[in-house]
Amino acid sequence: MKVLILGAGGLTGRYLVCESKRRGMEVASFTKQELDISKTDIARDTLAKERPELVINSASLTSLELCEENPALSRKVNCEAPEAWAKECGRAGVRFVHLGTDYIFDGKKTSAYLPQDLPTPLSRYGKDKAEGEKRVLRANPHALVVRLAWVFGHGGKTFMSKLPGILAEKRVVELAGGRTGSCTYAGEASRIILDLAEKRVEGIFHGVQAGETTWKRFAEKAIELMKSEGRSVVCEEVRELSQDKIPGLRVPRPAFSPLDILETEKILGRKIPEWEKGLVEYLREIGW
């Protein structure tokens, strides 16, 4: 099978390329520099040239602050482009997978969010991602949307991805508090996405690892694991701060946004590993 991966230069995209090749798939991958999905008119020509059987869109404008500053670009990348690709894939008989986010919710629920829960976004990013999901499924009812959350992995720009290096260098680590959610090692996320695609399911599914956590709990678990392997850990204290004290975090995030994975596990016929196991896998990958 040939798979075309959009946003292949991003964290999840890179792992999707590796996992697809590991499964023996033929891969056509495009980074943001190689294929700008905001140019929606190139979808048809790209499909005709590459002739894939599956397209996975991992391209997204994920900076909440940038989305607020440039709403037109956010709408183009997170909403209009996925719709265009979903429509063209439907026309060409190509399966289409689009990646979503927990940030479409406001965090006011007291239990994990279900795939069918209605979006209640707090930010421009969340609004456009929610509208993007809606448009994708309207343009192509056979499309698959897989929601991810707090993704971490090698070479990632996210705080969780950078955390092991920070713990090895700083005595006091300050991070955003007051938030609980699901997290996902990018390697496991890529396995879930491809497993769901191979099952030929459609609609909305959640692709996170089992359990919920906070950034502080994640950091403390990383310290525990690193020390158990005899790795150098300089950090002596993990300190939670309110979001308004964290430089660069100007846009509200949901305070509670775990994603329920029961339906995903039913379809896959397996239990998805807890996030702690994903952290172990990640630390081993980077040699910590």
Locate the predicted segments by residue.
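Mid/C-terminal beta-alpha module of Rossmann-like enzyme folds, strongest
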Residues: 192, 199-249
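N-terminal Rossmann NAD(P)H-binding glycine-rich loop of SDR-like oxidoreductase domains
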Residues: 1-22
